[in-house]
Amino acid sequence: MIYVVMGRETIPDVSAAIGFTASFLPTAERRTIYALVQAVSGAVRFCIDGTTPTATKGVRLTEDSTMEVWGAEAMRDFLCIENIVQSDPTVEVIYFGRGGLA
């Protein structure tokens, strides 16, 4: 399988729980398969099960670490928040979908 970049975004303010921008999420027309996520300038906490993360609840993604979020449901349910109040991290996201012939 070959994956191609479908889009990218920077989430600049994670002081409150926030998810991916809806226009990047999978639809019948937009075949996004997964999102590559990086915490920049600080750690964040995230949930992909529909619960809301807090500064002390959720899976911790350390500064400059990356992780992948696979599948439409997990991408819709993804929420993240800064791990330490006023640490001002940002989140970089690259969205991938199917492409090419393999």
Predicted regions and their residues:
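A short "linker-to-beta-strand initiation" element
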Residues: M1-T10, G100-A102
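Low-complexity intrinsically disordered segments
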Residues: V91-L101
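Noncatalytic modules at the cell exterior or secretory-pathway interfaces
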Residues: I33-A35, G71-P89
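Intrinsically disordered, low-complexity Pro/Gly/Ser/Thr-rich segments with frequent PxxP/GP/PP motifs
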Residues: T56-E73
